[in-house]
Curated annotation (Swiss-Prot):
Keywords from the UniProt entry: Ribonucleoprotein, Ribosomal protein
Membership in a protein family: Belongs to the eukaryotic ribosomal protein eS8 family.
Coiled coil: none
One Pfam family named in its UniProt record: Ribosomal_S8e
Annotated GO CC locations: cytoplasm; cytosolic small ribosomal subunit; nucleolus
Record bears the keyword Ribonucleoprotein: yes
Record carries keyword Ribonucleoprotein: yes
Gene Ontology terms: biological process: maturation of SSU-rRNA from tricistronic rRNA transcript (SSU-rRNA, 5.8S rRNA, LSU-rRNA); translation
Organism of origin: Leishmania major
Name of protein: Small ribosomal subunit protein eS8
Entry-linked NCBIfam families: eS8
Highest taxon of the lineage: Eukaryota
InterPro entries named in the record: Ribosomal_eS8, Ribosomal_eS8_CS, Ribosomal_protein_eS8_euk, Ribosomal_Se8/biogenesis_NSA2
């Protein structure tokens, strides 16, 4: 059977040793951790107690991520694992676990933002180091250019709607900068080894500032 969660081999509080009077049971079976890595999707079903099935993700490259303050969610590409409070080894091996911090593709959120508010974040972007480096290396693909939404082709009715929406709207500067760069920090809230998915939320507010400081400190 291999790994077991049996109590038979444990010592008692008094120091005595339990006498093993029976064989190990299937219910006591333990399994190796999934260690879900970043890569082309590969999942496998695992039969659990009661005939139920867990979905064990071995490789994942996409997930559903929510932008909580805007009440939207998009399926986006996972780009990198950038921080894990538990272990730097999990960052080095790009292992996806619950509560790890990942960088996700900003394109779907940027496109939604342009369609919903009529604001093209690329039009007035400052030449940040990351953006300049990306342009120099020619990373901007034809696919990304095709996905871009043209805010200048909107109807008068839609422009009036945009004006109404922008009246009391304000986006956090740190998030806007990330959207311009094309990479947004997010936290995984699902359990890839149990549900077979890597879903999560974008970092905002104090949480985002905390992890930005951590990453800056890590670089030094």
């Amino acid at each position: 059977m291999g790994i077991v969660r049996s109590r038979l081999h444990k010592r008692k509080i008094t120091g005595g040793k339990t006498k093993i009077h029976r064989k190990r049971m299937k219910a006591e079976l333990g399994r190796l951790p999934a260690n879900t890595r970043l890569g082309a999707r590969r999942v496998s079903p695992v039969r659990a107690r009661g005939g139920n099935f867990k979905i064990r993700a071995l490789r994942l490259d996409t997930g559903n991520f929510a932008w909580a303050s805007e009440a939207i969610a998009h399926r986006v590409r996972l780009l990198d694992v950038v921080y894990n409070a538990t272990s730097n080894e999990l960052v080095r091996t790009k292992t996806l676990v619950k509560n790890c911090i990942v960088a996700v593709d900003a394109a779907p959120f940027k496109r939604w933002y342009a369609k919903h508010y009529g604001i093209d974040l690329d039009a007035d972007k400052k030449s940040t180091k990351a953006a300049v480096a990306a342009e120099k290396k020619g990373r901007k693909s034809a696919h990304a250019a095709a996905d871009k939404y043209d805010v200048n082709k909107a109807s008068p009715k839609l422009q009036r709607e945009w004006t109404r929406r922008r009246r009391n709207h304000r986006v956090e500067k740190a998030i806007a900068d990330q959207l311009r760069e094309g990479r947004v920090l997010a936290r995984i809230t699902s359990r890839p080894g149990q549900s077979g998915r890597a879903d999560g939320i974008l970092l905002e507010g104090a949480e985002l500032q905390f992890y930005l400081k951590r990453l800056e400190k890590k670089k030094k």
